[in-house]
Structures are given as C-alpha cells and as structure tokens.
C-alpha cells in the first residue's frame, strides 16, 4: 500500500469540509457514466453563474488499457480548449506514475504541455513536473515524508529562464484515524494551518487559519458537516469576514444527488448580495 499523500493533498480532509457541499452563485450539473467493463469512462459538467449569466461546460472521456497500466484521457471545454493526457502507472515500479499532459487551443494555435512523474510508497512520496517550453521550462518538485502519523513536506518551482526559485513552500502535519493537523509556510511570507476532527460517524469539523507576514489581514474559519442519515447531510461554515455558508445535500436515489447552498453576508444582511446555488450530480 502506498498511503503517503502528495504535497497538494496535505490537509485535504480539512479542505473537503470547507469546500464540498457548496456551490454559491451557480447552477451546476455533473454527469458521470462508464462502460460495463469499466474500461471507458465519460463525464461532463455544466455551470451557469447567476450573477453574470455566463455559462461554461466541459467534457472528458477516459480509456484504460489495464494490462499495460495505460490511461488515455481527452478533455474539451466551451472555451474551445482541447486537452490530452497519457499516463502509465505501476508498471516500471509499484507506485510509479508517468504522465504526459498537453493542451491545444485551436482558435489561437497555442500549444503547451507538461511531463509529470510521481512515486509513492508507505513512508514517502515524491514528484516532479516539467513544462514543455523551449524558451525556458519551469521545473516543479515536491516531496513528503511520513513517520508514525507525522508528515513533513516540501514544494518548489524553479524558473530555468531566470535561474531562480519561484516557489519555496514547507509543510508539517500529523494524521490519525479521526484527527488531522496541518501547517504550512509559503515563500516565507504566507503562514497557515488547519485542524480536522471526526467527532463521530455523523459529525466532522474543521478549523482553518491563515495570515501574511507584514500584514494585519488574518483569515479564520470554522466549518462542520453533519450526516442526518445515510442519504442526507448538512454543512455550515463561517469566517472572520462574517460570511456564512450553508449547504444541504440529499441523495434522491442511487446515482442522483441534489445540493442546495447559500452564502450569507452577515455584515450586510439587509442589503442583499447573498448568493444561492443549486447542483445536480448524476452517475450511472
């Protein structure tokens, strides 16, 4: 088993309590299906933003060649951007994944791509991404070490065109079955931390704190999720800007999920400007 998370997944449980079950200011529909054999997967989503009226959508198809560990993914969105991803996993070595990710914009002819590699084991995970740019690619790298529940991570990016580090981040945390602690420092100026607690089978809570050196702008938030039953959940969160988020998620039937959410400005309650959201998830 390769259970060590990537750098981006550190503190993920706390982030999920804050982010999942909400969709303020939009109507969203997600559709997912796959072939009987599981070799082909299809997904599409559409968003309509209530404040601007702008709509967007995307389509993704995925084809797996399991005997060779290959996965081919095609992506398209309403901005007419085409993406192709080819990944090869667990064949050269257990836990090793190699990926080629390309993007093409037909309207402008713009092309871009990345080469990605990651390797995960029980006590560590490492990875690197390289932009395909002959004028001077940017190299991204990260590493996470795990020991008896403790996690330490480092993330960097190096701009070869300017020969300097453009990102320099550190993280430290602790992970248990029902408790997670995560702290991070980005570029020596941005500090943050989060705490996740699974109180019982029905209640999850999270606290998030962040601040920037040389600034009085401190961000603080509390979030909670409560499972009414196996099909229904309530979510709530509030931050120090007096923004209150409420969410209701109901599984109407297997594969059909409804989400209702609202964002309330507590400082200007009578002035309006609040946002509501509606989401449908369909899976077959």
Swiss-Prot record:
Gene3D superfamilies: Porin. One of its GO terms (cellular component) is membrane. It catalyses: chloride(in) = chloride(out); K(+)(in) = K(+)(out). Ubiquitinated by PRKN during mitophagy, leading to its degradation and enhancement of mitophagy. Deubiquitinated by USP30. It is found in: Mitochondrion outer membrane; Membrane. PROSITE patterns: EUKARYOTIC_PORIN. There is a cross-link at residues 54, 110-111, 267 (Glycyl lysine isopeptide (Lys-Gly) (interchain with G-Cter in ubiquitin)). GO terms for biological process: sperm mitochondrial sheath assembly; spermatogenesis. Coiled coil: none annotated. The modification N-acetylcysteine is found at residue 2. Its main location: mitochondrion. The chain crosses the membrane at residues 26-35, 39-48, 55-65, 70-77, 81-90, 96-105, 112-121, 124-131, 138-146, 151-159, 164-176, 179-186, 190-199, 203-212, 219-228, 232-239, 243-252, 255-264, 274-283. PANTHER family: VOLTAGE-DEPENDENT ANION-SELECTIVE CHANNEL (PTHR11743), VOLTAGE-DEPENDENT ANION-SELECTIVE CHANNEL PROTEIN 3 (PTHR11743:SF28). Interacts with ARMC12 in a TBC1D21-dependent manner. Interacts with MISFA. Consists mainly of a membrane-spanning beta-barrel formed by 19 beta-strands. Belongs to the eukaryotic mitochondrial porin family. This is Non-selective voltage-gated ion channel VDAC3.
